Amino acid sequence: MAVTTHPLQEFYSGPDVPLSSGPDRARRQARMLAAVLRGVAGPAVILDLGCGDGSALAVATTQNPRHRFAGIDWSGDALRRAHALGLTVLRGSVSPRLPVADGVADVVIMSELIEHLVDPDAAVAEARRVLRPGGSLLLSTPNLAAWYNRGLLAAGIQPVFSEVSLRGVFGRPGRVVAGHLRLFTRRALTGFLTASGFRCVTVTGARYHDVPRPLGPLDRAFCRWPSAASILLVHARKE
């Protein structure tokens, strides 16, 4: 497969970009996946797009040993780490095309990937292409309308998760540049997925690991209302 680099791919291959999903995200992803796989009769094929260093994929693989897993990422460093964990991984990108045949996957995972993409339409179309009919998409992404972002924006402060530059953080809390390009509210995300040929089965909320500790209980409470939660979790099926 020919590999073409561009500035964003160089950014995500850089040494300062986090490669690990973190324990909270890994456990959350494994729980979502386990719930979906309960309805699958035989061994399923699961693709993790933007798998990073494979930390979340390793947890899911351990908890679901009878199923087949593969991760796809652009970062060579991330893939080396994932391979060292004994995982099946491929180097590739959701644009223009994944290195996977049509209709091979029972489940596609896009865990906090879509917010990093220039062309989410193409990415979700690729996820749909590689899914079998009725296959599941498990997608998570930061919520633009998280409870604290509503107050920040009203005060004239750039919302958490949003970024105006890859060079530094400007006008919002936090210090890490994550490369977020697209942010969604619950309504925008479900509308987008429906227009992309998916039926949204469930939408739930999750907490954000970087919320200051005193605000942790409040962040957990808002998980009951996904439209105001920190993280949006969607299970959608290919129509």
Stretches with model-predicted labels:
Residues 4-27, 55, 118-126, 130, ...:
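S-adenosyl-L-methionine-dependent methyltransferase catalytic module, highlighting the catalytic core
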